[in-house]
Amino acid sequence: MVFRIASSPYTHNQRQTSRIMLLVLLAAVPGIAAQLCFFGWGTLVQILLASVSALLAEALVLKLRKQSVAATLKDNSALLTGLLLAVSIPPLAPWWMVVLGTVFAVIIAKQLYGGLGQNPFNPAMIGYVVLLISFPVQMTSWLPPHEIAVNIPGFIDAIQVIFSGHTASGGDMNTLRLGIDGISQATPLDTFKTSVRAGHSVEEIMQYPIYSGMLAGAGWQWVNLAWLAGGVWLLWQKAIRWHIPLSFLVTLALCATLGWLFSPDTLAAPQIHLLSGATMLGAFFILTDPVTASTTNRGRLIFGALAGLLVWLIRSFGGYPDGVAFAVLLANITVPLIDYYTRPRVYGHRKG
């Protein structure tokens, strides 16, 4: 009789994986609630579309590979992938975009590598980057937060815009994106980058409606604080470790502070970097993915710091206003190298 030796890991704990994924899904509730509050019902519709698409895509691949569909879907990883992608895209993006991004994330970025535990890149961020590169206009068409919006779509209008491109009264995305100053709005990070390139001073930019009276932009600072609250709860539940979020946020804050001190007229202040865009979502929910992050404590600190540095560089000097997704994927590439040089020394072995 011939015994085959399978590749590691040799022990699997389906219940533990399912529990951690469920905790992460529960921790996302404050962030989702904040996005619903400031950006409307479109976020919920996108989550539903992404969740159904993720489950169907994963079930299809598992069926083709003749693996147990029910047992694998119970680990909740497909749901989490769909959720993370859905909250990362504009709430009123066309329905086919979130479906396309989710299917690509699950089938190409996850199952093509062998499924959960085998993928080297974060599937949700792969899906996001594919959409961003392919459809940059739709992926950057965020609504203004309700506090500065002229037109606030209801639940029915949100569904109609997502599936047809227009509200019941005939309004389109250009109408819905108008702010109280009559100007089409963008995210705080996008507004800052575009305005600096147009020659506006930071002092002028901070007087815009999206920044006026705010630390880091209307709506967005509260969304980030909500994701932070969910992340702290994950730490308390010991579902994630502190190394990656802390090193990521400290590095981002340090780089932003130094940059702002040296060039206050062209670079954003640290609070804008920390409380705008996908900062807290990335720190606690994306970078901490146990499959694609470093596996040693020292490695996690390096991994988080590298991602923080990359986010600041992309936001400050790159072509995209946020940069979290690109930073995550670039950091994922370095994980084997980081783990190799930070692996703990075996007891009894002398140092190289």
Curated annotation (Swiss-Prot):
GO terms for biological process: electron transport chain; transmembrane transport. The keyword Transport applies. The complex is composed of six subunits: RsxA, RsxB, RsxC, RsxD, RsxE and RsxG. Its EC number is 7.-.-.-. HAMAP family: RsxD_RnfD (MF_00462). The modification FMN phosphoryl threonine is found at T187. The lineage of its organism: Bacteria, Pseudomonadati, Pseudomonadota, Gammaproteobacteria, Enterobacterales. It holds the Pfam family NQR2_RnfD_RnfE. One of its GO terms (cellular component) is plasma membrane. Belongs to the NqrB/RnfD family. Part of a membrane-bound complex that couples electron transfer with translocation of ions across the membrane. Required to maintain the reduced state of SoxR. Keywords: Cell inner membrane, Cell membrane, Electron transport, Flavoprotein, FMN, Membrane, Phosphoprotein, Translocase, Transmembrane, Transmembrane helix, Transport. It is found in: Cell inner membrane. The keyword Cell inner membrane applies. This is Ion-translocating oxidoreductase complex subunit D. It is a multi-pass membrane protein. Its cofactor is FMN. It comes from Escherichia coli O7:K1 (strain IAI39 / ExPEC). The chain crosses the membrane at residues 20-40, 42-62, 89-109, 123-143, 215-235, 242-262, 267-287, 301-321, 322-342.
